[in-house]
A protein has these predicted regions:
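Conserved thiamine diphosphate
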Residues: 6-58, 82
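Thiamine diphosphate
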Residues: 2-5, 18, 133-227
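Short, surface-exposed amphipathic charged segments that create phosphate/polyanion-binding patches used
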Residues: 40-42, 69-70, 200-203
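A short secondary-structure junction signal
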Residues: 36-39, 64-67, 169-172
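Short, conserved acidic/polar surface loops in the N-terminal third of protein domains
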Residues: 3-8, 65-66
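A glycine-rich helix N-cap at a beta->alpha junction
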Residues: 1, 76-84, 208-212
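Electropositive phosphate-/nucleotide-binding environments in soluble metabolic enzymes
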Residues: 12, 28-35, 104-107, 114, ...
């Protein structure tokens, strides 16, 4: 239970509680996206050497009955980096080549060691996009770290994450037919958060940005996705 009550309808409090664990976080908004992007999370974790939380809305997505195009193991063959798998296994704990982890460090070295992981997080967005591009080339999709849907000259844009994005897509299409200049940005890679990729996804004409969060963080100036 992440808040005052248990909720199976896609509150994001539980996954937001993990955002400072150091895990990369990839979100899908539909059953088909779960099938398509789960390989991205696995492959990026191996190549980028960062653990992933691959998440989607409970019940709204996890229990949805929907026809999808499924993947076979053979479909993953050309996505997987075999060298990355070997390197991953080589770093596993093994009594034949022991190593020290979780040591006690004094102030002179603690934060130096803490900052040493920065290059891995800086590189991760490009790695995720690399594997998204491979998936796009394979099945004809257009997955990005942040996907935009709407008018090219939109003045008002919604930023959202999770199953609500599919509903927003349909609403945007309805409003576009009425001549409204609106759009939606769907967040896929939440951590590490790539600010430049978000800026690139938003049209230059935008005047208003509305961030829809599915959680409440009491005492904060804003909710996690907004911040």
């Amino acid at each position: 239970v992440a808040s005052h009550a248990l909720n199976i309808f896609g509150d994001h409090s539980d996954v937001y509680a993990c955002r400072q664990t150091g895990c990369a976080m990839l979100c899908e908004s539909s059953v088909q996206e779960v099938m398509d992007l789960t390989p991205v999370a696995h492959c990026a974790a191996l190549k980028g050497k960062i653990p992933f939380i691959n998440f989607f809305d409970g019940f709204r997505t996890s229990h949805e009955i929907q026809k999808i195009e499924t993947w076979d193991y053979e479909d993953l063959e050309d996505l997987v980096d075999k060298d990355a798998i070997k390197e991953f296994r080589a770093h596993a704990l093994n009594p034949n080549h022991p190593c020290e982890r979780g040591s006690a460090q004094n102030p002179d070295t603690f934060f130096q060691a803490r900052e040493a992981c920065n290059p891995y997080y800086d590189a991760m967005p490009a790695i995720v996009q690399e594997y998204m591009d491979k998936v796009n080339a394979k099945i004809g999709t257009n997955y990005k770290l942040f996907n935009y849907h709407g008018a090219e000259d939109a003045e008002s844009v919604i930023i959202a994450m999770g199953s609500v994005c599919d509903t927003i897509d349909e609403t945007i299409d309805y409003l576009l037919a009425q001549g409204k200049k609106v759009g939606v940005v769907k967040v896929r890679l939440y951590r590490p958060f790539c600010a430049q990729a978000l800026v690139d996804a938003i049209p230059d004409t935008v005047k208003y940005i509305n961030v829809l969060d599915r959680t409440k963080e009491p005492g904060s100036l804003g909710e996690p996705l907004y911040l």
